[in-house]
Amino acid sequence: MSTYLVGDVHGCLVELKALLAQVSFNPEQDTLWLTGDLVARGPDSLQVLRFVRSLGSAVRMVLGNHDLHLLAVYAGISRNKPKDRISDLLTAPDADELINWLRRQPILQVDDDLKLVMAHAGITPQWDLPTAQMCAREVEAILSSDSYPLFLDAMYGDMPNHWSPELSGLARLRFSTNVFTRMRYCFSGGQLDMLCKEPPSQAPSLLKPWFDLPSQVAGEYAIAFGHWASLEGKGTPENIYALDTGCCWGGELTMLRWDDKRYFTQSSLSSNTESSGDIAL
């Protein structure tokens, strides 16, 4: 029984299956953690959703910003852009079933036995773990409810960018969503910067990667995240694992076997080598 952590799949089904074949992944015995962004930009978003769903309880995933954007497009809130390559998913005969399954997936995973936390973008240094879990439950509750289109319509935006326990309503949900699915940089006081997408070597000096600020979570739990392909899986402190290595941009799909911290990679087999970026959620 092994636990495997895989970075952003982005519709790269062939690479995902090849990576799982490297370790003879067995869904009856092993567990697969996925950092989110299952869909968009790669060639096989529809088949990725079908495959991941078919693995049932062997999968522990979190939602990413592209997954949320798909939900918004399907709900008629956002526009379908050709570069996302999700048109076949939107018109698939099982689209309703897949979308309803997707919106009921977690936005945060915590395993107390493994001392492991996973979120697509990370955990703000302004939160301790109970606060992160509380905020995740709030987002998950609205996404799985009949009111989810109201949330999807309100989630786009960069403000508020500073945590306060007094935040409420849609503003609180937007902040939490930005932390879990969009965050890269913070100011020294912990405020989110939602504009800079450059690697740390090219970022303004006022900004720090969220993982370089003192963390209330990372002292006790390891944190695994995706989202930030330009990191190339490098430059994080001990106990923080960056797993998005840009497969859909022509890079690699990366897997970490948690049991022995061994990495496995699968080079991109797709012709899609656009410049890295993300939906401005």
UniProtKB/Swiss-Prot annotation:
Q: Which gene encodes it?
A: apaH
Q: Which family does it belong to?
A: Belongs to the Ap4A hydrolase family.
The record's EC number reads 3.6.1.41
Q: What does this protein do?
A: Hydrolyzes diadenosine 5',5'''-P1,P4-tetraphosphate to yield ADP.
Its recorded name reads: Bis(5'-nucleosyl)-tetraphosphatase, symmetrical
Q: Which UniProt keywords are given for this protein, alphabetically ordered?
A: Hydrolase
**What's the domain of life for this entry?**
Bacteria
- The answer to whether the entry has keyword Hydrolase is yes
- What PANTHER family does its record include? CYTOCHROME C5, PTHR40942
The record's catalysed reaction(s) read: P(1),P(4)-bis(5'-adenosyl) tetraphosphate + H2O = 2 ADP + 2 H(+)
Q: Which Gene Ontology terms cover its molecular function? A: bis(5'-nucleosyl)-tetraphosphatase (symmetrical) activity
Recorded hits in HAMAP family, A to Z, give:
ApaH
